[in-house]
Regions:
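Membrane-interfacial amphipathic/re-entrant helices at transmembrane-helix boundaries
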Residues: 1-24, 52, 61, 65-92, ...
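Hydrophobic alpha-helical segments within and immediately flanking transmembrane helices
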Residues: 21-28, 41-79, 126-127, 229-237, ...
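Alpha-helical transmembrane segments within multi-pass membrane transporters and channels
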Residues: 66-131, 273-278, 282, 309-310
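Short loop segments and helix-boundary regions at transmembrane helix junctions
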Residues: 33-41, 90, 99-146, 188-193, ...
Length: 322
């Protein structure tokens, strides 16, 4: 019975963690699918989303700010004092963070990647690493080098209990929100006009241009959507772990990249599957082996997939004629 409860608890943790990995992994795969670039700056956009979210929460709920700016007092009481206020605050946090980080992604694409679009891939890769280091150190210098507490406005109350395993409201909110976003993105890509244009650009950029599709718009849209989803993951990550720091994006970013490769880089549904699988495997390893080995296992999975199935679980092998 204890073993079953342990497995169940780790599965719940794994699905929650996998939801975040899947959301971040989509940012990697949607960009790679269109421009064949591993956007290593994506992990820092994930981090930026957390800091933007914390800033919005501070403005909306800080009593210190309300004392300095009396016109903020009614809003502070509303957002901090009722369930409706908390829900509205979360929606504002997510919306502002998604817009800010999405625009950051568009700016990065315009000035760091677009000039290198016809250059060797290594040049764009080096540019991505440079942008990542710039964003990380910008937060280090301009905000703080210390961990900042990230309040959880949802609280730690239990949503329901399975056996002896309590499932918190926060975990339920994370899982449901991520699933809704994944379904919405899949529907957008497969059915909307812009989504079809992005798919056409991904399949054959030159042919799509000849058919009248705005290639630059499709690529820019990809660089908005991916970081925007990463911003949501950043906020949830802050609430889940209770703190954020300037270099918080590195490990989740690498693991999300592993999830994207596991599912099939460039395949949206593969990234979703890879994220959930990696989260579950990592949580089970933490419960049955040691928390110290969870990162080792994630990187071992990446190495094994690259060796034995580089196309990923849902990816396709491509043969190039020479």
């Amino acid at each position: 019975m204890q073993l079953a409860n342990l497995i169940l608890a780790q599965l719940v943790n794994g699905i929650t963690l996998g939801s975040l990995y899947a959301l971040i992994a989509l940012g990697y795969t949607i960009v790679y699918g269109i421009v064949l670039l591993i956007n290593f700056a994506h992990s820092e956009l994930f981090m930026s989303g957390a800091f933007v979210g914390l800033g919005v929460m501070t403005v909306l709920t800080s009593s210190a700010l309300a004392s300095k700016f009396p016109w903020l007092a009614p809003a502070q009481h509303f957002f901090a004092g009722s369930t409706t206020g908390i829900v509205c605050m979360l929606l504002i946090m997510f919306l502002v963070s998604m817009i800010v980080v999405g625009v950051m992604g568009m700016i990065i694409e315009r000035f760091a990647y677009r000039p290198l679009r016809h250059a060797p891939r290594l040049a764009a890769l080096i540019s991505a690493v440079g942008v990542s280091l710039f964003l990380q150190n910008a937060v280090l210098l301009w905000i703080s080098a210390q961990q900042l507490p990230f309040p959880n406005p949802i609280g730690e109350s239990t949503a329901f209990t399975i056996g002896t395993v309590d499932v918190s409201v926060l975990k339920v909110v994370i899982i449901i929100t991520v699933i809704v976003l994944l379904v919405a993105l899949d529907t957008f890509i497969s059915r909307s006009r812009f989504g079809k244009a992005m798919r056409a650009t991904s399949q054959d950029r030159e042919a799509a241009g000849l058919m009248g599709i705005d290639i630059n718009l499709s690529i820019t849209l990809a660089f908005f959507i991916g970081p925007a989803l990463g911003a949501v993951a950043g906020i949830f990550n802050g609430m889940y772990y209770g703190s954020i720091v300037f270099n918080m994006g590195f490990l989740p970013g690498i693991k999300a990249f592993t999830a994207a490769v596991l599912g099939g880089i460039g395949n949206l549904r593969g990234a979703m599957l890879g994220g959930f699988l990696l989260g579950i495997v990592e949580s089970l390893a933490s419960g049955f082996i040691s928390t110290g080995y969870k990162d080792v296992i994630a990187f071992a999975i990446l190495i094994l997939v690259l060796i034995f199935r580089p196309g990923g679980l849902l990816g396709e092998s491509v043969l190039e004629k020479v």
